[in-house]
Amino acid sequence: MKYRRLSLAHARQDSGQAASNARSRRFARLLCSSIAPLALGFSADAFAADETMASPFNRGAPNDAHGNLLDEIRRGVPLRHVPASERNTRGAGGSTLADAMRRVIDSRRTAFDSPPATPASPSPSWSDDESPPPTPIATRPASRPESAARSPRHSSPPHSPPASAESPSPRSPDASPSRTPSPTFSFPSPSRTSTPRTQPPSPLRERPERSPAASPRVASPRSAHSRGSTQPPSNLSTPRYEPPTPLQEDPERTPVASPRVASPRSAHSRGSTQPPSNLSTPRYEPPTPLQEDPERTPVASPHVTPAEHAQRRPFLLQKPPQVPSWRKKAPSATLPDSHAPARPGGGQFTTPASGAAKYVAVNSGASDAFAAGVNAVAIGADARAQGQESLATGWRAQADGHRAVATGARAIASGRDAVALGAGSIADRDNTVSVGQRGSERQIVHVAPGAQGTDAVNVDQLNLAISNSNAYTNQRIGDLQQSITETARDAYSGVAAATALTMIPDVDRDKMLSIGVGGAVYKGHRAVALGGTARIGENLKVRAGVAMSAGGNTVGVGMSWQW
């Protein structure tokens, strides 16, 4: 329902009449029974009305104040009473206002009391001249737990069943069950100044699921004393709003919070302005630095067997050894066999100092690592890094050379910039990489083909190179053999041709011309020659011939002078 606010002094007036008017007193009682639960911080869903109507109050008020009457009163909007002559014709005042207030009271009573109690006596008649008193509308009781925890923000008085249909009348927290009812109180005089009071947050704006700890049963601020008295009861204390502590947590947002939260206010003094002495503010205690996470620490699980515990237990980061001064002479390099024997006993284990250290484990009882060189690093039992900027990792690994690296058990790198990879590897020459030692060689496997001139080649690249070289050599040798064969054939044919030319007979002394044919064979190569001799003078003679063979043709000419 929407109403307009008016001041408490105006609430006692009706068309300019005094507060003794019966209608004004009834309205004041209804107004008090509806506002007090809101001031105590009760849930707002119990005061929801079924319909919205115009209020005869604050019509034409400054700042154009509109809205629910209860909400406006809680926010401090000044209320102004509208006389009957200014009311609308639709019955927006009088019995309609009483009907709305009865709906609010009935909704509150039904929501917090299930089922509602039957009133002991009928309600007083409503002396309104506009309409007869309406019948209260029954609303469906809201489902609330009977034993909900009290909210830590607002404490509520204990619950007691209602005493009448207009307003429930619970017992005061400090009143006894046999106490006689006290007279009803009315509003104070308009001239009396009231002390400003801090209002709690509006329950109408809070969501029910955000206040799970509110009490499902709300007690009425009105006492069960007689309604004829004009003085307020002595045992009625005004509740004060107390803001929650900074460390106070929402039970719904905090999974580990208890479902039943105790009220921070003491039940013995709800009207006191001083906090109770037995109320202690919870303090936040941070976890210790060495506190373990059960999910991240394997040894915290109760289902780990002793064997698994021995494998998964953490280790202790030992204190680094003391590095000797540069003025001291470093011990000479020795072989691993000359190292001191390992001390008996197992390594000490404890929780690692950081989360990343749990991925490193050391299990050895040998001597400590020793790094004598400048900027040298030695990791492992009895590891020795004696060269400058050297690195020795592994049991009894030894790096003696400058910037040498020895990785593996008993690995030795004594050369300058030498690298010994693997257990027992020895790199004793400068700028070398060793993967073994003489008599205990190793293969370097899974090597990619080399791409640059200084890259290593694998077996596939070597076989391809050999194959290409063999093919080239064979081709060249074949060509050479062919050339030699052809040369021999020509030579043999030439010898046969020359022999065939010499076989032609000469001319006689008494003849002038002679023609002859000759032939010869040399190592399987044959030749045929044709020639002739002519006597030109008595003392002069000329001779010519041609020989033919498989290697080619041969031509010869000769002349002789005789005396």
UniProtKB/Swiss-Prot annotation:
Observed phenotype of the null mutant: During infection of host cells, loss of actin tail formation.
Extent of Polar residues compositional bias: 228-238, 269-281
WH2 domain mapped to chain residues: 65-82
SUPFAM superfamilies: Adhesin YadA, collagen-binding domain (SSF101967), Pili subunits (SSF54523)
Gene3D superfamilies: GSPII I/J protein-like, Serralysin-like metalloprotease, C-terminal
Recorded GO CC terms: cell outer membrane; cell surface
Keyword Transport: yes
Transmembrane regions listed in the UniProt entry: 510-519, 525-536, 543-549, 553-563
Keyword Transport attached: yes
Region (Disordered): 1-20, 109-350
Biased composition annotated in UniProt, kind: Low complexity: 138-150, 162-197, 211-227
Subunit text: Homotrimer. Interacts with host G-actin; the interaction is direct. Interacts (via central and acidic domains) with host ACTR2/ARP2 and ACTR3/ARP3.
Domain notes: The central and acidic (CA) domains are required for binding to the host Arp2/3 complex, Arp2/3-dependent actin polymerization and thus for actin-based motility.
Protein name: Autotransporter BimA
The organism of origin for this protein: Burkholderia thailandensis (strain ATCC 700388 / DSM 13276 / CCUG 48851 / CIP 106301 / E264)
Gene name of this polypeptide: bimA
